[in-house]
Amino acid sequence: VEAEGMRVFDFDGTIYDGESLFDLYLYSARHDPKAFRYIAPVLRYAVKYKLGRATLEQMEYGVGKMTEGYLTELSRSKRVASVEQLVDDFWDRYYARIKPWYQPESDDVILTASFDLTVGEACRRLGVRNLVASEVDVGTMKVTYLNFSTNKAKRFRELYGPDVVIDEFYTDSKFDQPMIDMARHAFM
């Protein structure tokens, strides 16, 4: 399948100047400092994975549990109206960190390890309809899919077909090599 003109973009570090999930985390901790208790365990899982001391499955489990705890705590916080409102307020403040070179087209695909709950709002504001992200069930605050590492290419193929060819892929990371391999042109 050739997707003529298909443009796929990594989000954090590529379109967004920084790591949006980390920025949201710090932003939310300003509203409820209890959120700080979740950063060390998440970083520990990420470092172990990067050093080869944890499998993708272990990282998925650990990050999933910590994210669920963090989002549940925020959703119950008396200091936060709702997680959705917090995300909306976050983008009111941080939307300017979308890099000016990015000129969105409605059929672009944003591919990210960050959560649909957070990046979905940025996509809405950008006018981009296609988001492939880690997924959170907002009813339970459970992570239902972690779109990280090899999961990115796996999920992308599930959604767009096993033989899809990307015309242009934009990323800031060599960890996206499986996506780079699917593209006619890749830009870092």
Each model region followed by its residue ranges:
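Active-site neighborhood of HAD-like aspartate-dependent phosphohydrolases
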Residues: 1-54
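C-terminal cap/substrate-recognition subdomain and adjoining C-terminal extension
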Residues: 2, 83-188
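A general boundary/transition motif marking the beginning of the first structured unit of a protein
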Residues: 12, 51-54, 71-78, 90, ...
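A structural signal for alpha-helix termini and helix-coil/disorder junctions
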Residues: 30-31, 49, 53, 69, ...
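Solvent-exposed, non-transmembrane amphipathic alpha-helical segments
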Residues: 33-36, 41-48, 63, 103, ...
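Short, compositionally biased "basic patch" segments
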Residues: 45-73, 123-126, 130-131
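Metal-dependent phosphoesterase signature
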Residues: 59-98
